[in-house]
Regions:
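FabD-like malonyl-/acyl-CoA
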Residues: 173, 185-186
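Alpha/beta catalytic cores of group-transfer enzymes, especially the acyltransferase/condensing modules
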Residues: 1-39, 162, 175-181
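C-terminal nucleotide
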Residues: 28-176
Length: 186
């Protein structure tokens, strides 16, 4: 499926969707390291809370969105860091504490892409920690922070996703977009 999306559809996508479809397990979250392809399951117990997935009903084609542009931008970040003697295999290897030192080496929009990747990596690990501690309110806070980063640093949300997220937060403990973004679905 991944080869088809990349080679025939022209979408420079990752492997998360395929892994979720093939390895998804009821009442569990799948923690996937996309660089090593190692994965593990974590029990999802929300107590009296429910997990809802909403759809914008706004059609879009990822190949016609800025999705591939975001992939290229992340590649540019790696190249610029390499020119500055910072060699990494993927952006998530950058530590949060190193972001301040790196900021002046990148144009603002590329720094924000990097900051999203690095802080999202931490949010994922914090989410797993909160999940293992059954801290549902912390899970909601992390979802909110993630969406704000996707909106402001990675810039992949859009009007429809932001509207749903904003409305959901009025009655939910947390809300974030899921999928590739750009306000719609294929």
């Amino acid at each position: 499926a991944w080869i088809t999306e990349v080679n025939y559809c022209g979408l420079n996508c990752g492997i998360m969707d395929q892994y979720s479809i093939a390895l998804g397990k009821e009442n569990h979250c799948l923690l996937l390291d996309t660089s090593t392809r190692k994965y593990e399951y974590h029990k999802l117990d929300l107590g009296d809370y429910k997990l809802l997935i909403l759809k914008t009903n706004k059609p879009r084609k990822l190949t016609e969105s800025k999705y591939n542009e975001r992939v290229k931008e992340c590649g540019f970040v790696k190249e610029i860091l390499a020119l500055n003697n910072i060699k990494i295999n993927n952006l998530c290897e950058v530590k949060i504490d190193d972001l301040k030192k790196i900021k002046d080496k990148l144009p603002d929009h590329l720094f924000r892409r990097l900051r999203h990747c690095v802080t999202e990596q931490k949010r994922v690990l914090d989410f797993i920690d909160a999940l293992n501690k059954n801290d549902v309110l912390k899970l909601g806070k992390i979802l909110n922070e993630s969406h704000e980063s996707l909106k402001n640093d990675y810039e992949v949300t859009g009007y429809y996703l932001d509207s749903i997220t904003s409305s959901a937060r009025k009655v939910a403990i947390g809300s974030r977009m899921t999928g590739a973004g750009f306000s719609g679905w294929d």
